[in-house]
Regions:
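Acidic, divalent-metal-binding catalytic cores of TOPRIM
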Residues: 2-388
Length: 388
C-alpha cells in the first residue's frame, strides 16, 4: 500500500482536521456494484424502460443540490437516482466516495492476481464509474491545485466525476445575488437595506491576494506552512456593523495586507510563480478577485461570514416589521395577534440558506451543468459506437 494513503493530510487537500470540517452524515461503498453492474441491470428491464444512472454524493445535504444539477437531463430514455453509497459504517466526505470506489477495484484485482501498480492519475476509478454510475463531489481545493494530490488527480482525470468548481455546495448557497431573497424568506420583509453583491465583492477583493498565496502553498504540498485554517483566521470579519459595513472589510484588508507582506519576506523568490498562478486562476480556472468567496472553505464562509452578516440585517428588518405592526394595529389585542402571527412566520437563517437555490442562475452552476451534459453526450457516443 502506498505510504501516501497513510498520510491524512496528503489526501485532504484542505489540510483541515475532520473536526474543522462541517460534520455531515456520510457513508462508504459496500459490495461490488459498478457501472457495468448497473448497465446489466438496465438491460434486464424492458426495452421501453428508462435507463437508470446512479449518482453517488458525499452527504444527505448534497442530494438536493445534485438533483437540481441532473434533473434537467432526465428524459424518456434516462433518469438519475442521487444517493449515498451504502455501508455498515458511516464515513464522511469526498475521499470516502472516491477512495472506496478505487479500493474495491484493487481488492478484486488482488483476488484475481491482476493487481497493477498504484497509480495517482485517477484512472483506477474508470472501471467502477461509467455511463451508469457517476460520482458527484465538492471540489474543495482539488480543482484549484490541479492534480497536486491523489484526490485532486481523480477530480481532474476521471470522466465520470462531477464537481462543484466552488469549494463546496455551501459556497453556492451563499451566492451573493441570491442573498436578498434569502433575507426575504427569513423576515418576510422586502426592504433592501443592504447591498450584498457589493459587500461580497469588496470582501472577495480584500482576501484575493492572500487566497492566491494559500493556493500557492497547496500546489507545492507545503501547506503546513500556511494552512486553510491559518488563512481562515486572517479573513475572519472581527465584527460586523450594519451602520458601518465597510469597517470590517477594511479590517480584513489590513490583516491580509500584513500577512501577504510576511509571506513575501518568507518566500523572496516566489514573485514570478505567484504572478503566474494568479494569472492562471483568473484566466484558466475562472477565479476572479470579485468572486473569491466562492472558492474559500465553504463552512467558514457560511458560518463565519454570511450568517453573522445576515443576522444583523434580519434583526433590523424584523424590528422594522414589528414596529410597523404596532403602528397600524387598532387595539392591543390585534397587535398581540399580529405580532404572534408574524413571529411564527419568520424562519431560521441557516435553514433558509441551506434551502436557497438561487445558485442556479450563477455561472458556476452553468459550468457544472455543462460538464454533466458533456459527460452524458460522450457516454451516449460510446454506447452507440459499434462493438469490435
Amino acid at each position: 500500500m502506498s505510504t501516501e494513503n497513510n498520510n491524512p493530510q496528503r489526501n485532504n487537500p484542505g489540510g483541515q482536521p475532520d473536526s474543522f470540517r462541517r460534520k455531515r452524515h456520510r457513508t462508504g461503498l459496500s459490495g461490488y456494484i459498478s457501472s457495468q453492474y448497473q448497465e446489466a441491470a438496465n438491460r434486464l428491464r424492458s426495452k421501453n424502460a428508462r435507463k437508470k444512472i446512479v449518482a453517488y454524493v458525499e452527504s444527505y445535504d448534497d442530494i438536493l443540490f445534485w438533483r437540481s444539477v441532473l434533473s434537467r437531463f432526465e428524459n424518456e430514455s434516462r433518469y438519475f437516482e442521487v444517493m449515498l453509497p451504502s455501508h455498515k459504517v458511516l464515513e464522511r466526505g469526498k475521499k470516502s466516495v472516491l477512495m472506496n470506489l478505487i479500493m474495491k477495484e484493487r481488492r478484486e484485482q488482488e483476488r484475481n492476481d491482476t493487481a497493477q501498480p498504484h497509480d495517482d492519475d485517477g484512472s483506477g476509478l474508470h472501471s467502477r464509474l461509467g455511463p451508469s454510475m457517476i460520482a458527484c463531489v465538492d471540489a474543495d481545493y482539488d480543482y484549484l491545485i490541479k492534480g497536486a494530490t491523489e484526490t485532486s488527480a481523480k477530480i481532474w482525470n476521471s470522466p465520470y466525476v462531477l464537481h462543484t468548481y466552488a469549494y463546496s455546495i455551501e459556497n453556492l448557497q451563499c451566492y451573493a445575488p441570491s442573498l436578498h431573497n434569502v433575507v426575504v424568506m427569513v423576515t418576510l420583509n422586502d426592504n433592501r437595506i443592504f447591498d450584498f453583491e457589493e459587500w461580497m465583492r469588496q470582501y472577495s477583493e480584500a482576501i484575493f491576494p492572500l487566497f492566491v498565496w494559500n493556493i500557492w502553498h497547496y500546489r507545492r504540498t507545503i501547506y503546513g506552512q500556511f494552512t486553510i485554517k491559518d488563512f481562515n483566521r486572517v479573513i475572519e470579519l472581527g465584527g460586523f456593523s450594519l451602520q458601518n459595513p465597510e469597517a470590517c472589510i477594511q479590517n480584513v484588508r489590513n490583516k491580509c495586507y500584513k500577512k501577504v507582506g510576511w509571506l513575501q519576506r518568507e518566500h523572496p523568490d516566489a514573485k514570478e510563480s505567484y504572478l503566474a498562478l494568479k494569472r492562471e486562476l483568473i484566466e484558466e480556472l475562472g477565479v476572479t478577485p470579485q468572486t473569491t468567496y466562492l472558492y474559500i472553505q465553504g463552512h467558514h464562509l457560511f458560518d463565519k461570514v454570511v450568517v453573522p452578516v445576515m443576522q444583523k440585517i434580519c434583526t433590523q428588518l424584523v424590528r422594522q416589521r414589528e414596529q410597523e405592526i404596532r403602528r397600524q394595529s387598532r387595539h392591543s389585542t390585534q397587535m398581540r395577534n399580529e405580532l404572534s402571527c408574524y413571529s411564527h412566520s419568520t424562519q431560521d437563517i441557516a435553514q433558509m440558506l441551506k434551502k436557497n437555490m438561487g445558485y442556479v442562475l450563477s455561472d458556476t452552476f452553468g459550468r457544472i451543468q455543462a460538464d454533466a451534459e458533456k459527460m452524458l453526450n460522450e457516454s451516449a457516443a460510446t454506447e452507440d459506437a459499434p462493438q469490435q
